């Protein structure tokens, strides 16, 4: 768990004290600049999730408005069982729960721009790192990741899946990446046509 606060050398206790009271096994403190963030959080170019190691690193992200404790407990048990058995290929998997300051995001009306998920507060994403070993294992990973996400989705009470396009597994559809409202899709497609008329940047999860 990372607590990162801008403009101070030590994160204020009002944020850390409730978690420190739980008696963590270890805590580490550091101070630096914005450029240190990737290193602190394990996503620099030298860290495993971002290196070309031959591993598969599928994520299954979902935006949430709040945590559903029942769903969280179910996901915890499923993830624990899948990653801790002696024969599991997913022993290097991890689970990201991301929450950021929302003041700037929510300063705009949710319909002011084509970005769809201003009302969401959290991003959850299991990262199932494993060594590829055929399509059967790929399916196991896909089934596991989607099952985890489905539990969180069901617990959210939402009627459409909200996903973070940069983490997306790839089977979510454009409505999950960019919002289910037709006008958002049309606006993004219009901008795509305006700024990239020759589709030079139509690689992963394209809007058009």
Regions found by a protein language model. Name each.
Residues 1-208:
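Soluble FAD-dependent oxygen oxidases
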């Amino acid at each position: 768990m990372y607590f990162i606060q801008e403009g101070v050398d030590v994160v204020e206790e009002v944020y850390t004290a409730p978690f420190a009271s739980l008696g963590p096994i270890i805590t580490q403190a550091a101070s630096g600049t914005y450029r240190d963030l990737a290193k602190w959080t394990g996503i620099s170019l030298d860290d495993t999730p971002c290196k070309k190691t031959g591993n598969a690193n599928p994520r299954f992200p979902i935006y949430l408005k709040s945590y559903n404790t029942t769903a969280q407990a179910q996901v915890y048990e499923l993830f624990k069982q899948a990653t801790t058995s002696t024969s599991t290929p997913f022993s290097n998997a991890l689970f990201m729960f991301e929450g950021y300051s929302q003041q700037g995001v929510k300063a705009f009306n949710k319909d002011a721009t084509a970005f769809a998920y201003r009302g969401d507060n959290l991003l959850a994403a299991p990262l199932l790192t494993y060594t590829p070993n055929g399509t059967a294992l790929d399916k196991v990973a896909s089934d596991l990741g989607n099952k985890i996400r489905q539990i969180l989705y069901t617990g959210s009470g939402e009627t459409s899946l909200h996903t973070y396009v940069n983490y997306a597994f790839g089977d979510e559809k454009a409505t999950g990446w960019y919002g289910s409202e037709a006008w958002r899709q049309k606006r993004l497609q219009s901008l795509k046509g305006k700024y990239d008329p020759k589709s030079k940047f139509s690689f992963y999860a394209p809007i058009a």
